[in-house]
């Protein structure tokens, strides 16, 4: 009996480490919780010392949540520095296309590609001290210094801007202005929005915490049933 209990606890901790949700909550609640933390990993593995969100874990979980009749809503908890654009946008598109209500909550930060992830929900919250960093697309590694490279950068950036504008209340011109701000970050281009600032700019729906996020999600779930 003790061995079975130890095995269950170890298995549960393993699932919590991989997916950010304990098995017990899955069995007793109609709400699925998705955590997006650290750096959104792309097609290459990051170092063992980095906290990451792996798209190969997240995308199947979202697909399973869509097909699971016991799941009535999704709560997305976000504290990310950003990461791979393609993977981040893929997750954001999956969240936005779910037929079930989704609420997001920005806890520490939702930087870079974390911005589309935060606004992909049906309703979004940010804690008063939460931050969102908006900046142009950047790339590491070998870059060929030709005009086609910069055109490619612009196309990627246009995809991000288009997604954010279509899933929030911010205007395209204002988002671009914040993205290209040069007077705020000492060694970078872009802007940092804190708490209510993100709400005033139209990126986030409301400032609040976990209680507010659950309350709103239950409201959306009830409205869907009615």
Task: Locate predicted features.
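N-terminal organellar transit peptides
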Residues: 1-115, 119-135, 139-226
């Amino acid at each position: 009996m003790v061995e079975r209990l130890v095995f269950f606890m170890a298995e549960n901790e393993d699932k919590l480490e991989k997916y950010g949700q304990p098995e017990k909550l899955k069995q007793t609640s109609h709400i699925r919780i998705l955590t997006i933390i650290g750096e959104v990993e792309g097609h290459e593995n990051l170092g063992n010392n980095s906290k990451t969100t792996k798209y190969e874990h997240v995308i199947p979980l979202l697909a399973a949540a869509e097909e699971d009749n016991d799941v009535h809503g999704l709560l997305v908890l976000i504290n990310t520095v950003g990461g791979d654009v393609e993977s981040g946008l893929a997750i954001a598109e999956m969240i936005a296309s779910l037929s079930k209500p989704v609420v997001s909550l920005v806890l520490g930060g939702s930087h870079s590609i974390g911005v589309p992830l935060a606004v992909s929900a049906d309703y979004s919250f940010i804690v008063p001290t939460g931050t969102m960093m908006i900046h142009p697309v950047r790339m590491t590694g070998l870059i060929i210094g030709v005009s086609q490279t910069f055109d490619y950068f612009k196309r990627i950036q246009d995809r991000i801007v288009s997604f954010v504008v279509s899933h929030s209340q911010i205007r395209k011109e204002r988002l671009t202005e914040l993205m290209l701000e040069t007077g705020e970050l000492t060694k970078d281009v872009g802007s940092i929005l804190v708490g209510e600032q993100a709400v005033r700019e139209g990126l986030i729906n409301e400032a609040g915490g976990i209680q507010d996020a659950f309350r709103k999600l239950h409201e959306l779930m009830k409205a869907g049933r009615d």
